[in-house]
Amino acid sequence: MIIAFIRLYQYCLSPFLGPSCRFSPSCSHYACEALARHGATRGLVLSVWRIMRCNPWSRGGYDPVPAEPFR
């Protein structure tokens, strides 16, 4: 269900906003992968942490979803 909302954002809203994410993969793609790989709770925590780091003062760059659950 959460991934459906992210996909809706990706296809309906994101094209009008233009590229603004400082990371690769984009924050919305990261969130979908984190949710699929780690489940709702950990996936949401990882996604929120990523979105908080995506700001003008961040260097950005390549930041993949961690393979192992964080502790």
Swiss-Prot record:
UniProt keyword annotation of Cell inner membrane present: yes
Compartments it resides in: Cell inner membrane
InterPro entries per the UniProt record, alphabetical: Membr_insert_effic_factor_YidD
Transmembrane segments annotated in the record for this chain: none
A Gene Ontology cellular-component term: plasma membrane
Domain of life: Bacteria
Membrane topology: Peripheral membrane protein
Keyword tags: Cell inner membrane, Cell membrane, Membrane
Described purpose of this protein according to its UniProt entry: Could be involved in insertion of integral membrane proteins into the membrane.
HAMAP family cross-referenced by the UniProt entry: UPF0161_YidD (MF_00386)
Family: Belongs to the UPF0161 family.
Protein name, entry field: Putative membrane protein insertion efficiency factor
Lineage: Bacteria, Pseudomonadati, Pseudomonadota, Betaproteobacteria, Nitrosomonadales
